[in-house]
Structure formats: structure tokens, C-alpha cells
């Protein structure tokens, strides 16, 4: 069965969005959840986070946005609810208790006069319990029905993708209509550059021409990791000029040993440009995954 998703940067989430994040690293979690929480605090929205973490341990707030969230917890704008209180009964995940807790928090935020409420929880721990995946599926389906028609609620359900099997991740993802991702590194309406984390690299969308070489080179340098491959996802890239290919070749040659660039999901028209130049003239650059025709 084909499933439809809206893919949205975290900064574009809006009330009614019940979003899914299966993060591949702490950095990805910080960039999505940290921005989600920060944006809510910055716009005077209520933020509810189901977690046993202390305020200074929340992803991305101190390390990325350089703010201490403690004052926001003291005035009630940021509400941290421990797992035992929010969704555990006799030490086990209790979906009914989770749903009741979140619905109550939504009602309280509305009574307090907030124009919107943001909800999030890292549920990887629940998936590791016996039968946790099935319990999570039921909980997510009911929560989707509650959030989708809302005019003031948005939520991100987050898990570490290593906490469960690919099949479980797919089933849980399919209970959401929105897939949330990091905000773009660059977007001028012609070229959009977004960080990717599994695999590590960048996704390019639109057209990469001479006017955007500098920003592309700068962004590419920012994701370099010694002795690691950098993947460039070309699925949505409709045009790349010869100057950009030359830039890639120069960059690849300068990468430390063991590094290199991998071009994933090459479109036929983009591949034709590369074939015209010749792969042998692009040392350090290799074809990656994705079919080409």
C-alpha cells in the first residue's frame, strides 16, 4: 500500500502536524528537536516535553542555541513531564496514560491562553520493552486522530532509529502524515541544500549554477569529516553546471585519505553532464546508490 507523507523542515511545522523523526545521531536530534523547542519558546508557545532529562540536558538548547531553558520551566512555558508520571504504569509503557496526559496538557495550555502548544517525546525506550512496538502503534494512531484536526497543537514523535528494526520503524512512520527534518542550510528558491545524517552528507534540490558555487562550497566544507565519505543526494537536483563539477573534483582531491564524495540518486540528465566530462576526470568522486536510466 502506498503511503503519502508531507516532508517538512522543522521550522515549517504548523498546528495539526503530527510529525515523525527517526534520528540517526545526537546531532540530528539536536538540530530538529532543539529548533522545535527553541522556536516554541521564542514565539511564546507552550512546549511540553515527556522526558526524564533535566532542562540543561535537552537536545540542542544549550549546545546549539546557547540558552538555559531553566527559566522557561520555572514560569511554566516549558513543561517537562517525567516518564513515570506521563506514561508508565507499574514500570511499563501505558499508552492510555500517555494519551490522557497529553490531552490534559493540551487543555491546560489552551486554558492558560497560549496560542499553540508543542509536544514531543523520545519513545525509543518504549520500543525496547516486550510488545512495545505494538503498544506504540496503537498509541500513535489514536494520537494522530487527536492532533490532525487541531488548530493549536503540533507534535514530534521521536525515536533513535537504532532502537528498533527497519520494519518497526516503517510501521511507526506510517502512522504519521508528516516527516520532519532539519532546516535547510541554504534555500533561495532556486537551490536548496539540506543536511542528511543517514548517510552523512547533503541533499541538493533545484539548480546548482555559477551564482551558487560559493555557498555550495562553504556548505560542503562544513560537513567534512576526516576519513569519511560525504554523500550528495542528487534526487531532486535538476541542473548542475560544469563549474560545479570542477568544484567537486577539487574538493574531493583535497579530502584526507579514506574520504571522498559519493553521488547518490543521479538523475539521467545530470548523469549525462558527468558522462560528458568523464568520471576519470573526477578523482575521489564515485557513483552511489539509486538507479540511473
State where each predicted segment sits.
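Positively charged, polar, low-complexity stretches
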Residues: 1-192, 272
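STAS-like cytosolic regulatory interaction modules
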Residues: 71-74, 149, 159-239, 243-293
Amino acid at each position: 500500500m502506498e503511503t503519502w507523507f508531507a516532508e517538512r523542515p522543522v521550522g515549517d511545522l504548523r498546528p495539526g502536524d503530527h510529525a515523525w523523526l527517526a534520528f540517526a545521531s545526537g546531532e540530528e536530534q539536536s538540530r530538529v528537536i532543539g529548533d522545535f523547542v527553541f522556536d516554541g519558546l521564542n514565539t511564546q508557545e507552550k512546549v511540553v516535553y515527556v522526558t526524564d532529562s533535566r532542562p540543561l540536558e535537552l537536545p540542542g538548547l544549550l549546545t546549539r542555541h546557547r540558552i538555559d531553558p531553566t527559566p522557561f520551566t520555572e514560569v511554566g512555558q516549558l513543561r517537562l513531564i517525567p516518564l513515570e508520571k506521563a506514561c508508565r504504569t507499574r514500570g511499563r509503557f501505558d499508552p492510555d496514560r500517555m494519551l490522557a496526559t497529553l490531552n490534559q496538557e493540551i487543555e491546560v495550555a489552551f486554558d492558560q491562553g497560549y496560542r499553540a502548544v508543542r509536544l514531543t517525546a523520545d519513545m525509543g525506550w518504549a520500543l525496547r520493552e516486550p510488545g512495545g512496538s505494538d503498544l506504540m502503534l496503537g498509541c500513535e494512531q489514536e494520537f494522530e486522530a487527536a492532533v490532525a484536526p487541531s488548530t493549536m497543537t503540533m507534535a514530534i514523535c521521536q525515536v533513535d532509529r537504532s532502537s528498533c528494526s527497519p520494519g518497526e520503524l516503517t510501521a511507526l512512520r506510517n502512522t504519521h502524515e508528516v516527516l520532519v527534518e532539519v532546516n535547510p542550510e541554504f534555500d533561495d528558491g532556486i537551490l536548496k541544500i539540506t543536511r542528511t545524517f543517514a548517510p552523512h552528507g547533503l541533499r541538493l534540490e533545484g539548480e546548482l549554477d555559477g551564482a551558487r558555487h560559493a555557498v555550495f562550497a562553504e556548505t560542503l566544507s562544513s560537513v567534512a569529516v576526516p576519513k569519511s565519505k560525504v554523500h550528495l543526494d542528487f534526487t531532486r537536483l535538476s541542473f548542475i553546471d560544469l563549474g560545479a563539477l570542477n568544484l567537486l573534483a577539487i574538493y574531493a582531491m583535497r579530502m584526507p585519505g579514506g574520504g571522498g564524495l559519493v553521488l547518490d540518486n543521479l538523475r539521467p540528465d545530470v548523469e549525462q553532464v558527468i558522462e560528458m566530462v568523464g568520471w576519470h576526470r573526477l578523482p575521489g568522486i564515485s557513483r552511489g546508490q539509486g538507479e540511473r536510466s
